[in-house]
Design a protein with these regions (language model features):
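Axial heme c-ligation environment in periplasmic c-type cytochrome domains
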Residues: 213-219, 239-288
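Bacterial N-terminal signal peptides that target proteins for export
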Residues: 1-13
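Gly/Gly-Pro-rich "capping" loops immediately C-terminal to redox-active cysteine motifs
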Residues: 205-238, 253
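Periplasmic c-type cytochrome electron-transfer domains
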Residues: 128-133, 137-179, 225, 232, ...
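Structured, non-membrane catalytic/scaffold regions adjacent to prosthetic-group chemistry
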Residues: 28-167, 289
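The canonical Cys-X-X-Cys-His
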Residues: 192-207, 233, 251-252, 267-271
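Electrostatic cytochrome c docking/interface patches
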Residues: 170-195
Length: 289
């Protein structure tokens, strides 16, 4: 190859590398990845803070800090402007520690007494560590404001988030989550499936279905109903430290306002039912038994 050809060839090669490398490689700080329908947008923290629609908000009920706090934030609906979200889809938020929560489309766009915001931690104004933890809730934290914000489950206040993506509803995305279709319409396991997705699916998988990695699968290789008594499992879910304690323990306790006794019973009904439906999930398709 002649010297005159090397220059243009090298330039082309470097350009191709730059196009295929994720934006986060070149970013100087934390980034938030937003993906939907095959398109990916990577937002740099400083770029987000420079947006004209950034506002200052104050929470009255803050799940991470347990006390009112003021943040600079952008409305989640504004961040998702131009993104097509089907009526039955969810916005999946993934955190650094493997925590994953599914935000229903109707909740994201509620705007009637409930508004979701992405709070942004500025480099020159760092947030304090979360109580009992050594890190803050940043750099990105989803918080809710409005008269009805207290009705949003604590599991839908994810902090330290790294990505948001539009996905099918969990049961459609992972059919192996579903209860037996022949179950009676009023069988408690049916409602239990919904509660499980809202409360447990953030950390656990079921039949290897799910995106979370913070906790173990709850059906493979064994379902907890197969080695816990009913009373023991209820105690573990309500307050894990009342059953066992170890230094790396991560599962939180659940107050009655976050998980009612009725909801706890529905989760157990679902787990009991699923213990006879062991399979390995195939995303978007049939399960493998």
């Amino acid at each position: 190859m002649t010297a005159t050809m090397i220059g243009p060839a090298l330039t082309l090669a470097l350009s191709l590398v730059a196009l295929t490398m994720p934006t986060s490689v070149w970013a100087t700080g934390p980034t938030l990845t937003v993906s939907a329908d095959g398109s990916v947008h990577i937002f740099d923290r400083d770029a987000l803070l420079a947006r004209t629609d950034v506002v200052e908000i104050t929470t009255s009920r803050d799940v991470a800090y347990r006390t009112p706090r003021t943040y600079r934030a952008v409305a989640l609906a504004k961040l998702l402007e131009g993104v097509a979200i089907p009526p039955d889809a969810v916005v999946e938020a993934v955190a650094q520690d493997g925590f994953v929560t599914q935000l229903p489309r109707d909740l994201v766009y509620a705007n009637d007494g409930i508004v979701a915001y992405v709070a942004i931690e500025a480099a020159d104004r760092p947030w304090p560590p979360i109580p009992a933890k050594d890190k803050s809730a940043g750099a990105f934290y989803i918080v809710w404001l409005g008269d009805q914000a207290s009705s949003v489950p604590t599991m839908m206040w994810p902090y330290q988030i790294v990505s948001l993506s539009v996905q099918d509803a969990p049961a459609k995305r992972w059919p192996s989550l579903a209860v037996d279709p022949m179950l009676p319409a009023l069988h408690p396991a049916r409602d239990g499936q919904t509660v499980f997705v809202n409360k447990c699916f953030t950390c656990h998988t079921m039949n290897q279905a799910g995106s979370a990695s913070a906790g173990p699968d709850l059906n493979l290789p064994m379902n907890p109903t197969e080695y816990f008594t009913d009373a023991g499992l209820r105690a573990l879910i309500r307050d894990p430290r009342s059953v066992r304690v170890w230094p790396e323990q991560r599962m939180p306790s659940f107050a009655e306002e976050d998980l009612s006794d009725e909801e706890l019973g529905l989760i157990l009904a679902y787990l009991n039912h699923m213990s006879d439906r062991k399979s390995r999930a195939t995303e978007g398709g049939s399960s493998k038994r």
